[in-house]
UniProtKB/Swiss-Prot annotation:
Disruption phenotype: No obvious phenotypes.
Domain of life: Eukaryota
Membrane topology: Peripheral membrane protein
A GO BP annotation: cytokinin-activated signaling pathway
Region (Disordered): 27-130
Swiss-Prot/TrEMBL keywords: Cell membrane, Cytokinin biosynthesis, Cytokinin signaling pathway, Cytoplasm, Membrane, Nucleus
Similarity-based family: Belongs to the SOFL plant protein family.
Protein name: Protein SUPPRESSOR OF PHYTOCHROME B 5
Placement of sequence motif SOFL-B: 52-61
UniProt organism field: Arabidopsis thaliana (Mouse-ear cress)
Motif SOFL-A mapped to chain: 18-23
Biased composition (Acidic residues): 35-54, 106-117
Role according to the record: Involved in cytokinin-mediated development. Promotes the expression of cytokinin synthases (e.g. IPT3 and IPT7), thus triggering the accumulation of trans-zeatin riboside, trans-zeatin riboside monophosphate and isopentenyladenine 9-glucoside.
């Protein structure tokens, strides 16, 4: 269609109100007016091949169908979300070990009881250290 046949541009017809359906004029329906509306008092033939434009309201999908999903799609989305969450979580394994530190304040080996029993008994001078082993990645807050 030639640009000369399209009426209703800002230069040709400034009185056309927005929101109204404007018709494109073909050479077979030349009129004196630059633009016209479908609400004329004259009876016009309605034909599918005519100059009228289809309404935009029927061209898009219904809103209700855009929210409908198949069960398989929902399952796939949940699986992807779980994988992302798992990779973002801190993967830390903590192993706690007690290390026995036998502290003898007596440098001399005075064995008051020499009955052949060489077991270490808790004399109150022993201390224990706790050792933590971290395995995996530790994510610091605020850096992601």
């Amino acid at each position: 269609m030639e640009s000369a046949n399209i009426f209703g541009s800002d230069e040709d017809c400034r009185s056309c109100e927005s929101g109204w359906t404007m018709y494109l004029a073909s050479q077979s329906h030349d009129r004196d007016d630059d633009c016209y509306y479908g609400d004329d008092d004259e009876e016009e033939e309605d034909s599918d091949g005519g100059d009228s434009m289809d309404s935009d309201a029927s061209s898009g999908p219904m809103e209700a169908t855009s929210y409908l999903k198949l069960a398989q799609e929902i399952e796939e989305q949940n699986s992807i979300k779980k994988k992302k969450k798992k990779t973002n979580e801190e993967m830390v394994l903590v192993e706690t070990t007690r290390v026995h530190n036998n502290i003898n304040h007596d440098d001399d080996d005075d064995d008051d009881e020499d009955d052949g029993d060489n077991h270490d008994y808790d004399d109150g001078n022993d201390s224990y250290s706790v050792v933590h082993s971290y395995v995996g990645s530790v994510r610091q807050k605020g850096l992601v």
